[in-house]
Amino acid sequence: LQVGYVGTQAHRLLASHDLNYGQAQPCLDLNQLSNLTGDASLACGPFSADSAYTIQPGEIPAGFTLHLPYGPVSSVTGPNANPITLVGLRKYSSPNCNPLTGAGCPPDGVPVFASIFAEDTIGNSNYNSLQISAEKRFSHGLQFQAAYTFSKSIDDASSFESELNPLNFRASRALSLFDARQRFVFSYFYQFPHYGLHGFADKVLNGWQASGILTFQSGFPIFITSSDDLELMNSVFFTSAGEPDQVAPLHRLNPRNPLHEAFNIAAFQPGPVGAIGNSSRSVCCGPGINNL
């Protein structure tokens, strides 16, 4: 019998993040301005980060503040004496564009840059486990080995394909997608006794052996993401940066029942507009694995 602890920490792991995600506040301001003025061309919402907008002179009411994604100032408070031009709502949508004068803004209304993804060594992870093993060496025709692991793995990104929360990298920290909380493996070999038989009976009844491997493992975490762009970032690489709101505990259902999903999907609802939802990047856990 052996009992041991195994733990690791890793730093500077490869992870992806968006350097040029859509700015939510300018989009929210534009949409509010559209509602106030009735100017439908200023309507802004999901997947609008690469759209172009022109605010006419005097269109911003007195006291209303419009946040700008780029330019010499961070915001403009109405009333505005001159038109304001926005080509894209990302920090680097149009690097040479001055929204206050229109100078350097793409005349075709198409931003110079959309998302700019970087793969940097900024990820972290840790793993802790209790490992127990027992072995019976071959005697009296029997040999077996059993191993049990109770572990937990946490990381910021389980692979470079996992996009970090661009507003807060640490908010992406969650269960590793390959985390298997419990795993039990049992292997055995048994040689049946040799009976003192002869002829046909000897050939049929003697020389039999039985062996096998049994594996029982808890399910992997469920990767949670939202692709409706309610966070107004329009940031999609291998996955989306968006998360829904988790409004109830996750309950695993019977996936073998054709009337069931793998879990109660009603536990997740669309998050607030202009913000990433409160759900963790991964939630424990999906269906387990039984291999006999």
Outline where the language-model segments fall.
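Short, solvent-exposed micro-motifs at the edges of structured domains
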Residues: 1-292
